Swiss-Prot record:
This is Ribosome biogenesis protein ytm1. It is found in: Nucleus, Nucleolus; Nucleus, Nucleoplasm. Pfam families: NLE, WD40. Its main location: nucleus. Residues 10-93 are annotated as: Ubiquitin-like (UBL) domain. Belongs to the WD repeat WDR12/YTM1 family. GO terms for cellular component: nucleoplasm; PeBoW complex; preribosome, large subunit precursor. GO terms for molecular function: ribonucleoprotein complex binding.
């Protein structure tokens, strides 16, 4: 019987979405043995592309849109496909395991990371926010280029929870002292100076989102509200006096007369968005329309906001607290990390009838940060309190077994913290708080181990 299976052949039509890897020779329809596996099909594609051992590319193989993880024969049997059919076989560059490149030590937990790249090759800058209340800028060699000054808040160390680059010379950070701060960064002078304080929240700020072209900033808070600010002080109204520290209330009035000791101007919000009933964990601008925003909350809901009218236009209710959020524009989906240890992909469009399109399982604790692969529309990175960053390919899915959860996927790679015993990855001191995926730098993450860690695929 094994001999018969090995001799069975099937027609395949090879295709790729990568124009640089098109097979120019005819025919594109081939007759191959059904005993072939992904590895052998990858070898076949390299031969058709005339790539030798030194230039060989590892390929993943998809049949009818599903990854091949067995022989073709087993795939046909599992999916009830007749061997007389012509199979559409797509080949795509395999996701190479991201190796640990380096890590940068901090004095306290690293709550957030962001990357500034695309300015000039070799001039990438990494932004980190820490529980010591400071933001730092690093180069990719691990040198601290600049550290922010301690905020003027009575000497209290107020932990930061979030930080984003707004431009080459501006960044935004916020945390447990309820305020959002805009900083000016000078790469030549190696200084980070607080330029503006934005005041509207009564409790800590969990997340910020920025839209550089409009200078707009969104902040999500534990007080259940979302605020909209401008990074230009003059565009914002006067800060609410009842939310200003007593030492700042008077100085706020004197900001135009500030002396060299620099009184930092404080301003209020352009708008406040209410509607969540529990802390708001994450907020983002819609990628193709900055007049729309999405927010995720511990109240289990994902909300869509029309910013010009300060109106909630849609609410999607899930079964768990939502801890993180990112957009996947190519699929018109939003990825949400949950307290239930999985990632739920949601279609936010009003026409969508199903809340959960896909569920990704593999973490052992809450999923608190998400980012997409800038080089692929299919890949996603997630950071969790279980001490890992996991890499997902959204094509690596199967039919879900639970009603209402859509397709189900498993991670393709797991990144552990450098120097950690992987058998104790989700123990004390291992939580990962933030992840960013950058085309030039790689996968950057920060966590409870007081490190910024960089992982990158070999050769990238």
């Amino acid at each position: 019987m094994d001999v018969d299976a090995a001799e069975t052949k099937v027609q395949i039509r090879l295709t790729t979405r990568d124009s640089s890897l098109q097979i120019s020779e005819e025919p594109n329809v081939l007759l191959v043995q059904t005993s072939l596996t992904r590895h052998k099909l990858s070898t076949l594609v390299n031969e058709l592309l005339h790539r030798g051992d030194e230039t060989r590319i590892p390929f993943d193989i998809l049949i009818n849109g599903e990854f091949l993880r067995t022989t073709i024969d087993e795939f046909l049997t599992k999916n009830g496909i007749n061997a007389e059919s012509t199979l559409d076989v797509e080949y795509t560059r395999a996701l190479v395991p991201p190796l640990n490149v380096t890590s940068f030590e901090h004095d306290d937990w690293v709550s957030a990371v962001d990357v500034l790249s695309g300015v000039q090759s070799g001039q990438e800058r990494i932004l980190s926010a820490s529980y010591d209340g400071l933001v730092r800028v690093w180069n990719t060699s691990g040198d601290v280029l600049a550290t922010s000054e301690a905020p003027n808040n009575g000497g209290r160390i107020t932990s930061l929870k979030t930080a984003k680059w707004l431009s080459e010379k501006k960044m935004v950070a916020a945390g447990l002292d309820n305020n959002v701060r805009v900083y000016k960064y000078d790469d030549d002078a190696r200084t980070i100076i607080t330029a503006l304080e934005l005041v509207n929240h009564r409790w800590g700020v969990e997340d910020v989102a920025v839209h550089a072209p409009s200078n707009r900033i969104l902040s999500a808070s534990s007080d259940t509200t979302i605020s909209l600010f401008s990074s230009n002080a003059k565009e914002n109204p006067v800060a609410p006096a009842n939310l200003l520290p007593s030492s700042s209330a008077a100085s706020n009035k004197r900001q135009k007369l500030s002396k060299p000791d620099r009184t930092v101007p404080a301003r209020g919000a352009l708008a406040t968005f209410t509607g969540h009933s529990s802390p708001v964990s994450s907020v983002i601008f819609k990628p193709d329309d900055a007049t729309v925003a999405y927010s995720a909350s511990h109240d289990h809901t994902l909300k869509t906001w029309d910013l010009p009218t300060s109106t909630c236009v849609d609410t999607r209710t899930t079964g768990h607290s939502l801890l993180s959020l990112c957009a996947i524009p190519s699929r018109n989906l939003l990825a949400t990390g949950t307290s239930a240890r999985h990632i739920t992909l949601i279609d936010p469009r009003a026409s969508a009838t199903q809340i959960s399109v896909m569920t990704l399982r593999g973490h052992k604790n809450g999923v608190v940060s998400l980012d997409t692969d800038p080089s692929s529309e299919h890949n996603l990175a997630s950071a969790s309190h279980d001490g890992t960053v996991q890499i997902w390919d959204l094509r690596n899915v199967s039919t879900g077994s639970q009603i209402g959860e859509g397709m189900q996927g498993e991670s393709v790679y797991t990144i552990y913290r450098q120097g950690r015993d992987t058998s104790k990855s989700h123990g004390e001191g291992t939580k990962v708080f933030s992840v960013r995926w950058d085309r030039a730098v790689g996968i950057v993450s920060g966590g409870e181990d007081k490190r910024v860690q960089i992982n990158r695929a070999l050769g990238s």
